[in-house]
Amino acid sequence: MPKPILVLVALISLSPLVAFAESHPTPAKATDITNEEVDAVLKKSLPKEDQQLKVVDVGPYNLAVGIIHREAAKDPTDGITSCLAHHNVTETYIIRSGSGTLVTGGHIINPKEVTGDSDINIKAVGPTASGFVRNSEAQVRHVKPGDIVIIPADVCHGWFGITDHVDYLSNRPDPDRMLPAGYVNPSIK
């Protein structure tokens, strides 16, 4: 292929990337989420409720940070744990307080898509399936404050063995920009 045509093909194929970069410039400032803000949201959240703190446009993708509070949960008697799998969003859990058993991976039994108009789809993690997983086919680990677990998109995850509670932050990179950039939890506006 002649050099001028090769250069033209390269420029045409790169133009969408340039347009995207121009429409999503890298932010010029940091975003803070204080411990007091996290505590304020936790005080108003219901047990097992996932609360998005903020969703920030960080240039090439959105980044969301949520806080989740889970109440006591007994060990399953049948070796099966309920689970969720978020199709497009990876999560990083950072355990703040309490402890429990986190189950990840395995094959989802009886998967059902969460309705598209639910808060979990719109504000928290995008399209999600719920179901069950056999603990014997999954990774099972006890987590405590300071532990960090990275859960890739479409990996099911669920909890049991929570003796009192577990509170954890969830960092959620959103490369598809499904979550609403600029969102701030009403409790901390």
Go through the PLM ranges and name each one.
Residues M1-V7:
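Bacterial N-terminal signal peptides that target proteins for export
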Residues V7-P16:
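Bacterial N-terminal signal peptides
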Residues F20-H87, Y183-K189:
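A short, N-terminal "cap"/entry segment at the start of jelly-roll beta-barrel domains
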Residues C83-A85, E91-I94, V140-R141, I148-V149:
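His/acidic/aromatic-lined binding-pocket segments of jelly-roll/cupin-type domains
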Residues H87-G106, G116-G131:
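Short, conserved beta-strand element in jelly-roll/cupin
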Residues V133-A138:
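Short alpha-helix capping/helix-loop boundary micro-motifs
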Residues H142-T163:
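Conserved metal-binding segment of the jelly-roll/cupin
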Residues D164-G182:
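A short hydrophobic beta-strand segment most commonly corresponding to one strand
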